Amino acid sequence: MIKKFFITGTDTNVGKTIVSSILLKKATMSGYQTAGYKPVSSGGQKKSSGFFNQDAILLKKSSSIILSDREVNPIAFFENAPPHILSKFQKRSIKKEELSLGLSNITKKSNWILVEGAGGWYTPLSCKDTFSSWVKQEKLTVIIIIAIKLGCINHAILTEKAIISDQIKCGGWIANNIFPKDKYNMHYIQTLLNYIKSPFLGVVPYFKNKNRINFKKIKIKLPK
C-alpha cells in the first residue's frame, strides 16, 4: 500500500523541511521506499543547471530512492516571496495538474511519499486555488508541524480546525523546538495536547547544528 502525506505548518519557518527529513529517514529505517516532494518552492540558489531550492535539496538527500532535481521540485522560483505572487510577476502559472503529475510519477517509484507545502495551510497557488484544495483533491493525509514559540497555540488550533472543516484527514502533529529549550516549552506542548485532537507524533529537539542530526535518537512516530 502506498502512503502519501502532506506536511503543513502553523506558519512559515516552523521547520517543516527538517522534520520532513527526519520522517523520511525514519520511514526508510522501517523498510519503506521513501521520497520527498516539494512541488512548489520560492527562494533558491544558483546551480550549473539553473537554480534549486535548499529545502528541496534536503528532501532529495533524505529520500531513499534516486530522484532528479526536477522530480523533487518541478516548480521553483528564485526569489523568496509567496509563490502565487512570483507566479503572476514571472508569468509562470502554477497548475494543480502539474503538481498531480509530479506526484503520480514519484508514486511509481516510491511507496512512502512526503509532500512538503509552502508556508501554512491556506497558502495560495493562484488567485483561485490554495495548496489545501490540491491536498483535498489528492486525498493526502496531513501532518501539522508546530514550532514551539509564542503564538503557536492559537495558530495550531486554527490550523487543525481548518483541516478538519475541509474534510481532510489529519494524521497527527509534531512539536518542533526551533529555539533552545526553556522552562515553558513543555507547558506549550501540554496545552497543545489538551486542545489538538489529532494524534501526537512526538517532539523534535532543538538542533544547534542541523548538519549533524542523530536520527535514531529522535523519538517521533510515523503517521498512519
UniProtKB/Swiss-Prot annotation:
Reaction equation(s) it catalyzes:
(7R,8S)-7,8-diammoniononanoate + CO2 + ATP = (4R,5S)-dethiobiotin + ADP + phosphate + 3 H(+)
**Entry's Pfam families?**
AAA_26
> Record keywords: Metal-binding included?
yes
- Output the InterPro entries linked to this UniProt entry: DTB_synth_BioD (IPR004472), P-loop_NTPase (IPR027417)
Cofactor(s) the protein requires to work = Mg(2+)
Binding, substrate:
42
Listed A to Z, the keywords are:
ATP-binding, Biotin biosynthesis, Cytoplasm, Ligase, Magnesium, Metal-binding, Nucleotide-binding
Q: Which residues bind Mg(2+)?
A: 17, 55, 116
Task: Give the EC number.
Answer: 6.3.3.3
Report the principal subcellular site.
cytoplasm
* Top enzyme class: ligase
The source's domain of life comes to: Bacteria
**Subcellular location(s) of the protein:** Cytoplasm
Output one GO BP term.
biotin biosynthetic process
Q: What does this protein do?
A: Catalyzes a mechanistically unusual reaction, the ATP-dependent insertion of CO2 between the N7 and N8 nitrogen atoms of 7,8-diaminopelargonic acid (DAPA, also called 7,8-diammoniononanoate) to form a ureido ring.
Subunit architecture: Homodimer.
Entry protein name: ATP-dependent dethiobiotin synthetase BioD
